[in-house]
Structure formats: structure tokens, C-alpha cells
Amino acid sequence: MAVHLYGHPCDMDQVMEIAKEHNLKVIEDCAQAHGAEYKGKKIGAIADAGVFSFYPGKNLGAYGDAGAIITNNDQVAQKTRMIANHGRIEKYNHEFEGRNSRLDGIQAAILSVKLKHLESWINSRV
């Protein structure tokens, strides 16, 4: 897991090289670096998956626990959705025991409004 901290990305070339040598998957922890870039690419979109926290104290915080996972891998995306929705594949069909980790409408609305201000908040910190 690569952890980007204080708005600064870690050395993703080195992380990805080590992962490739050892056939490992890489998850980027982007919780404290929303909007940061590494060599012109947004963090979270470099490795196999990126995770973001929307805990109230974070740069983009909701008013309760919340988070997001991003990936370009369709299998990872499907499995993540299933885990977040009680292991459900389709209505009344659950492949495994998952959990309820869906973002509720109130938190989504709060984040939607705050997201419009994120870039200016980031710029004011620099």
C-alpha cells in the first residue's frame, strides 16, 4: 500500500517497480492527498486501486464515516461493489457475506457540494 501524505504523492515509480518484481497488487491510500498528482497523473489512478477517506477531518470530509475506492479493473470494481452491498450480485442473490458500506444520500449530497470547493481549498493550503 502506497500512502500519499500531507498532499504529497509518494514515489510511485519505485512502488510500482517493486510490485512488478514481486507480482504484487498496489493500493494507493489517497486519504490525505486529495487532488495531488504524480508526474501529471492524479493519485489513485496510478496503481491497481485508490482509496479515499471522507472522514470529517480530511480535506474533503463528509459529516460521518465515508470513503471511496477507484479502479480501472472491472473485476476489482465488481467485487468492491459486492462487498459494500452485503455480497449481493443481483436482487436476492448473495455470493458471500458482505457488509453495508454504501454511501448514504445525505453524505453524498454534502460531498457533492463540498467537492466544488476542493480545488480552491487545496490551493489555499499550498
Predicted regions and their residues:
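Catalytic PLP-binding core of fold-type I/II PLP enzymes
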Residues: 1, 5-40
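Active-site region of PLP-dependent enzymes
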Residues: 33-39, 46-126
